[in-house]
């Protein structure tokens, strides 16, 4: 593997979890690798690295995207949220709903599901079961069978935006 030359680096101005920063990134580096390795945001998981499993899902300007398929340079001028942004020390209402419904087992896929669910609930605070299933259809889980994940997302809407309850 060859080491990138300085000319292969691109300076970007990006907001990550509410904090704006200017950083130099390898022009070929994925956003997932940049966030995990340079920003130390390891909630992002790399599963398939082909955009199929959803474990690397983040929100970019409010839309769920696969960070393994997105170049870090594409983050220039954008607002990015990762699973680390969902709570401020205590579990978020959505995370509490996942806990209440036992919507995770090994946990590898959980961050991706949480980010996809966050996109849905911020756009549609009272989704139907069918809308939840559709919103989560790009995320794979080998452990739960999905039912408890759907139940958790359906249970969370009344609590979104209310960290106390």
Swiss-Prot record:
Q: Which residues form the 2Fe-2S ferredoxin-type domain?
A: 10-86
Instruction: Write out the GO cellular component annotations.
Output: cytoplasm
Task: Kindly state what the record says about how the cofactor is bound.
Answer: Binds 1 2Fe-2S cluster.
Practical application: Due to the increased usage of tobacco products, the industry generates solid and liquid tobacco wastes containing high concentrations of nicotine, which dissolves easily in water leading to the contamination of the ground water. Nicotine-degrading microbes can be used for bioremediation of these nicotine-polluted environments.
This protein's pathway reads: Alkaloid degradation; nicotine degradation; 6-hydroxypseudooxynicotine from nicotine (R-isomer route): step 1/2; Alkaloid degradation; nicotine degradation; 6-hydroxypseudooxynicotine from nicotine (S-isomer route): step 1/2
Q: What induces it?
A: Expression requires the presence of nicotine and molybdenum.
Q: What is its EC number?
A: 1.5.99.4
Location of the protein in the cell = Cytoplasm
Co-factor(s): [2Fe-2S] cluster
Where is this chain primarily localised?
cytoplasm
Q: Which CDD domains match?
A: fer2 (cd00207)
**Uppermost EC category:** oxidoreductase
Entry annotated with the keyword DNA damage: no
Which reaction(s) does its UniProt entry say it catalyses?
(R)-nicotine + A + H2O = (R)-6-hydroxynicotine + AH2; (S)-nicotine + A + H2O = (S)-6-hydroxynicotine + AH2
| InterPro entries per UniProt | 2Fe-2S-bd (IPR002888), 2Fe-2S-bd_dom_sf (IPR036884), 2Fe-2S_ferredoxin-like_sf (IPR036010), 2Fe-2S_ferredoxin-type (IPR001041), 2Fe2S_fd_BS (IPR006058), Beta-grasp_dom_sf (IPR012675), Diverse_Oxidoreductases (IPR051452)
- Characterize the regulation of its activity: Nicotine dehydrogenase activity is inhibited by tungsten.
Give the record's keywords alphabetically: 2Fe-2S, Alkaloid metabolism, Cytoplasm, Iron, Iron-sulfur, Metal-binding, Oxidoreductase, Plasmid
Disulfide bridge positions per record: none
Which GO molecular function entries does the Swiss-Prot or TrEMBL record give? 2 iron, 2 sulfur cluster binding; metal ion binding; nicotine dehydrogenase activity
Give residues annotated as binding [2Fe-2S] cluster. 48, 53, 56, 68
Taken from the record, one Pfam family name reads Fer2_2
Task performed by this protein:
Component of the nicotine 6-hydroxylase, which is involved in the degradation of nicotine. Catalyzes the hydroxylation of the pyridine ring at C6 to form 6-hydroxynicotine. Can use both L-nicotine and D-nicotine.
Assembly and partners are described as:
Heterotrimer composed of a large subunit (NdhL), a medium subunit (NdhM) and a small subunit (NdhS).
UniProt name for this protein: Nicotine 6-hydroxylase small subunit
Q: From which lineage does this chain's organism come?
A: Bacteria, Bacillati, Actinomycetota, Actinomycetes, Micrococcales
Name the gene for this chain. Answer: ndhS
């Amino acid at each position: 593997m060859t080491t990138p030359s300085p000319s292969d680096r691109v300076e970007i101005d990006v907001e990550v979890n509410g904090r704006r920063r200017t950083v130099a990134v390898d022009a070929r580096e994925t956003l997932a690798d940049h966030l995990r390795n340079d920003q130390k945001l390891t909630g992002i998981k790399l599963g398939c690295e082909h955009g199929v499993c959803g474990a690397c899902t983040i929100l970019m300007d409010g839309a769920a995207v696969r960070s393994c398929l997105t170049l870090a340079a594409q983050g220039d001028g954008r607002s990015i949220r990762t699973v680390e942004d969902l709570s401020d020390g205590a579990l978020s209402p959505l995370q509490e709903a996942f806990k209440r419904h036992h919507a995770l087992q090994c946990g590898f896929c959980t961050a991706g599901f949480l980010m996809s669910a966050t996109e849905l609930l911020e756009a549609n605070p009272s989704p139907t079961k069918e809308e939840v299933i559709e919103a989560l259809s790009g995320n794979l889980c080998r452990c739960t069978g999905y039912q408890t994940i759907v139940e958790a997302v359906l249970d969370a809407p009344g609590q979104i935006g209310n960290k106390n309850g």
